[in-house]
């Protein structure tokens, strides 16, 4: 399964707050990004063949390859961005649990055009 996101990924670390009653909630910056990214994923899910759409959320062990292009040359917190992506994929019901992800390849491509993030998820 391949997915594309057009915006930069914020760090997922410290993206969630805890209320006094113990409930967790997303902080404003992360929630804004997650809403936009979720909308992009939902538009892509609608175009999936019915057989592939019925297999969501993906189950079992997964391997993920991420091609990430930055708009600028600033340093990025890759583990934090991975956290944000795992939260997003779980939130949009692409995957059931981030514990399923057994392998990750993070690639900084030479491309200067196109989307910021290209995600390929492979089962098995």
Tell what function each PLM region has:
Residues 1-124:
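Acidic, proline/glycine-enriched N-terminal capping motif
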